[in-house]
């Protein structure tokens, strides 16, 4: 009896056969049959955890939803209550040396950090003293600031926002490292974990080098810019989104919002798209390269990670703290404006691409330490206006503006959105108000990642085993949510995986769920259908081989078949030391 997978492959193969024939005939082609999410059968339940009275099981994904099929929105793991006769064995507390003080939580600190007025133990047990404290900063009352406390953000390699910061940034190691904070106009104290905190305002604004002829080309560019993931290609798992580890409320333009809103711009009119990006950076930080002080809660979570590899436990840990942390980052705010342009009006008014880009920029710059918007529009820009609500004349070049803002307070960001969507351009006062609000509501606008397992103290019991399991878990995480489980697109379309759904991002002359149809309005109408090379999609990597005599191991993958003459860029063989 034919399996569901085999049946879908045969139907998909028939579809591509009809596609090749239909292309030759120049006929519109139907969309391919939908592909629903397919899961692997659940694993067996783990043994009952005597400390939490829970057990878990996991499953994997064999195919993601595609061509309007059901996405993979379900959980890959689940827990249930259980009971066991075994006693709970708590992880042993660290053995502190004779020169160390042991906090009630078990953390070891240097004895000279006792009774110094600093909270070196998170539980404050180091300050339970009879005599007067020996303050590192003497009589000065210095505190760290919000930027120092938030340094080290977690990063998820697939794009979601981790819920907690792994670091304890109220720890100073007994030092009184001071610096001037221009945002508070005061001296502040630098946390031990932060090697450098630098304040320098920098304003950037860029427009894309091209005016995009369709939304998919723009989305493709956005996804490439936001991908931390090398092995997984354009694979993203944003999820529902948890409150950021930065604390407080952040106004965020997530990549998922841009994908959803811009791809949702559907119309029968001929359109083009321009993207304007702006960024205000006011601070940067660099974490200490070694001896980082992690939070007690992070250490407790590490101690309870099972010494036998359990995918759910390690995946859950990475969802909370990230697959990586930020070793170097920049604080600030940024915006992206995506203009949806009416191509017919542009052609009628004979406006070229350079004029469009010039007229749609904000023109932000820095003058005497103040951020201003100083874009002087010339008369050529008078005709570049946003279509007013209820106006059916269709003479405006700008049909709509998608506004995405990250950083700044909610009211300032909302005013910025409203102004741009109504007027089509940025108001200088509204822009300045948003830029000034970033200081109190910053976002992480740039990050350089380091694997999260590198901050686990190697002197804690079982550290090496758990580090090895976390390395494996990151590789499994990328492999599980991977576009290798998608079917290829036609006519040079790019495959992307976003929140459990495979997408085909089409070149501007093609459309359809698989980019199977030629769209003459995307090019000069009189041009014949062009010959376009199909892009194959790599299948998933095989498991690694055993370690060979030359201390290397190997794996392989195949270029997905089904498209006539399609090829994949990259190597079919993988090799690493072991």
For the regions a protein language model found, what residue spans apply to each?
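Acidic, glycine-anchored loop motifs typical of Ca2+
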Residues: 117-121
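Short Cys/His-rich zinc-binding micro-motifs
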Residues: 109-115, 489-496, 503-507
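Conserved HRD-motif arginine in the catalytic loop of eukaryotic-like protein kinases
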Residues: 512
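Beta-strand secondary-structure signal
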Residues: 56-58, 231-233, 361, 503, ...
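Short, surface-exposed loop/turn motifs at beta-strand boundaries within globular domains
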Residues: 38-41, 52, 225-229, 482, ...
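Short coil/turn segments at secondary-structure boundaries
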Residues: 71-73, 125-127, 261-265, 377-381, ...
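Membrane-permeabilization and membrane-interfacing ectodomains
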Residues: 132-491, 496
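Thrombospondin type-1
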Residues: 2-100, 104-106, 111, 123-138, ...
